[in-house]
Amino acid sequence: MKSTYDILKERGFIEQVTDEALIKKLFAAGKVTCYIGFDPTATSLHIGSLVPIMALAHMQANGNKVIALVGGGTGLIGDPSGKTEMRQVLTRDQIDYNAQCLGKQLFQYLDFSDKKALLLNNADWLTKINYIEFLRDVGRHFSVNRMLAAESYKIRLEKGLNFIEFNYMVLQAYDFLHLFQNYGCALQMGGNDQWGNMLAGTELIRKIAGKDAHAVTFPLITTSLGHKMGKTEKGTIWLDGG
């Protein structure tokens, strides 16, 4: 019998995996809890979001537990992955409103009844972090040299990467740890541009919890110029045309 991972691979969803043998073993052991993050820097998701949404739908249809994580906390910083310039900084009110809009959209694609899927917002835990404790307990597990070598930062290093953006990888990794510890989530999925951030999460879980966690990336939907289809690209096709 095919696992959900086999189905996703056959349908062309899989780009990179941390360890395919271990991921297949994870799916063979039973139902899997996975999560995908959604960036609330606009009031609507776009066509590039359909790949991760469809992946969650496949996971759910095959009896797995899915978590849609809206980045109400990380959105206050901005993800530098694949960007040549710093993102526009949005206010807390703007981020909160965008997060509500994305949540409503996700309810159209996933079944959240009876906790079949969970809609979470990382602002619920990231905004409550004690900075000194976070540096001591989490930050010490990160190598600056390895972070600077990550593809997600290479482009920005040429034009300037500020300290706020440099923290993004650490916060996303902490999200994975939080979901692993509190929801039994052992699999993160997302776009291929998130590979470095996702690996940081699996490493953090291994160092703090002493357990295996896994990551799977999807191919990116690109524009005619080969750029990632994102919220700031010209000609973006929004899922909510309004």
Predicted regions: what they are:
Residues 11, 91-92, 98-100, 104-222:
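Divalent-metal (Mg2+/Mn2+/Ca2+)-assisted nucleotide/phosphate chemistry catalytic cores
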Residues 12-15, 44-45, 166:
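Short, flexible loop segments at the rims of nucleotide/cofactor-binding pockets, characterized by
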Residues 140-143, 219-242:
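Catalytic adenosine-cofactor/nucleotide-binding cores of aminoacyl-tRNA synthetases and other
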